Amino acid sequence: MVKKIVRCLGILLFLFILLLLFNAYRAKPWPASAAKINLRPLPDSAIQHMSQAIQIPTISISDSAAPDTAAFQTWGAFMERSYPLVHQHLTRTCIRRFSYVFEWKGQRPELAPLILMGHYDVVPVEAAVAAQWTRPPFSGDITDSCIWGRGAVDDKNGVISILEAAEGLLRNGFVPQRTLYLCFGHDEEIRGPSTSWVVDYLRQRGIRPEMVLDEGGEVSESKTKELGRPLAVIGVAEKGHVSFELSINKEGGHSSLPAKETAIDILNTALYRLKNSPPPARLTAPVKEFIGRIGSSSDNLGHRLAAT
């Protein structure tokens, strides 16, 4: 009887594996967009602007816990000097001195606007790790087809990309259908209030956007070699987080006569229970679709199996 059960389970497992392999083989790559995008060569001025942006040490907090206002003032002047058409055709509003909102009026004001966001502040370079930098962190060196420095990937690249795109489109006489708002914060790295200030500013004006695009992912080649093509990662949500503050209120004691259960014992137990009670893991619809699209486009069998 036991042998029959084992044999049946083995047959079912074999059929299940065959089904997975069949589905993996049958999976077709997700159809690419039919839209053709003609990308113009990146102008040298854009590269220089990115390099210059990195050279401005807009550290959101220093060792003295006070921002370097001179650097943030320099950033404002840099934007005005580098993007004259943006400042000529868009309305620039300073929010609490160092955050900015640019309004680009569209042809159809009845449409809900789009918001493009980014931040130009960067984290400090700790003295203990400064020597590990292969290029000075605020040099903006252009070497080996790369622009080096703090903020090159978080997030001056995003801010400069938005400004370069806007400047180039304005140069060609482009006017968007929807109104666009370009919003740049100055204290994201320290979870500062500038984003809330911008939201309050927009809410007071009755602005309800169609979409908000903030920072974004990366275009990766090294991490997706099996695909044989670059992968652009578009984030559609943000992970949640929660912080707990645990406190114990218990009478004191003495090491010569320790209590059976001290405040530290109780706190340790609470921390242990908290650590061993994580939220249940789950795959949301966007994650499932991401895995399916990537897996079906991969030559890697493991990826294709995951897509099934």
Descriptions of predicted regions:
Residues 10-152, 171-176:
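Acidic/His- and Gly-rich active-site-bordering loop/insert found
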Residues 26-34, 202-205, 210, 218-228, ...:
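Acidic-enriched catalytic cores of C-N bond-cleaving enzymes acting on peptides and small amides
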Residues 60-61, 108-109, 120-123, 187-191, ...:
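Solvent-exposed loop/turn segments at secondary-structure junctions
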Residues 20-23, 164-171, 269-273:
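Short glycine/serine- and small hydrophobic-enriched flexible loop segments
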Residues 97, 111, 135, 177, ...:
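Short, solvent-exposed loop/turn segments at the edges of secondary structure
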